[in-house]
A protein has these predicted regions:
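C-terminal flanking tails of non-heme Fe-dependent oxygenases
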Residues: 1-189
Length: 189
């Protein structure tokens, strides 16, 4: 994949940070900290501050708790990386460069996750979201699409995708299904 394509897509991209506080709840089975969703962004980096369990991912229809490790980051691939497919090393603008090989168009998948609360202890986390420039067209990289590897997603301007994502109810996997191309010749669609 052309390095210039990566720079154009992610250089001067958007970055946001969110601090999450989940207070203790005496009846945790009756509430949810954050409903099930996948992240709209390209990449999410999460630090679970007080080592309290609460983040869960969905695998094969089952919710699996993510056990916090001291001083460790959790990296989530977001919907935009699932849509764009290319093979390259990307340097993200953090204190140290995060080299990350991105190979997607559904080869790497954004993950459905949620946060649950604890009956006795609060949970704290900080999430950093990194994404493309908002005025960029997102979709499978043209150099990756071929007769054998058909596009699984349509292209859309990043701003329109983000607007659509936030306009919907935060429920289930993702807004990504809106972009999915129904293609009978492509069994992975």
């Amino acid at each position: 994949m052309d390095e210039e394509y990566i720079r154009e897509m992610f250089g001067e991209g958007t970055q946001a940070m969110r601090m999450n506080y989940y207070p203790p709840c005496p009846q945790p089975d009756k509430v949810i900290g954050l409903t099930s969703h996948s992240d709209v962004v390209s990449l999410t980096i999460l630090l679970q501050i007080n080592q309290m369990e609460g983040l869960q991912i969905k695998k094969d229809g089952v919710w699996i708790p993510i056990i916090p490790l001291p001083h460790a980051f959790i990296i989530n691939i977001g919907d935009i990386l699932e849509v764009n497919k290319y093979d390259a090393t990307v340097a993200f603008p953090f204190k140290k460069n995060l080299n990350y090989q991105i190979v997607t168009n559904a080869a790497y998948r954004s993950i459905e996750h949620r946060a649950v609360v604890n009956s006795e202890k609060e949970r704290l986390s900080i999430a950093t979201f990194y994404s493309t420039k908002i005025d960029r067209q997102i979709g499978p990289a043209p150099s990756i699409i071929s007769a054998k590897n058909l596009a699984k997603f349509r292209s859309i301007e990043a701003a329109d995708y983000v607007r659509g994502y936030f306009a919907r109810k935060l429920d289930k996997r993702s807004y990504l299904d809106v972009m999915r191309i129904e293609n009978s010749e492509n069994p992975a669609s």
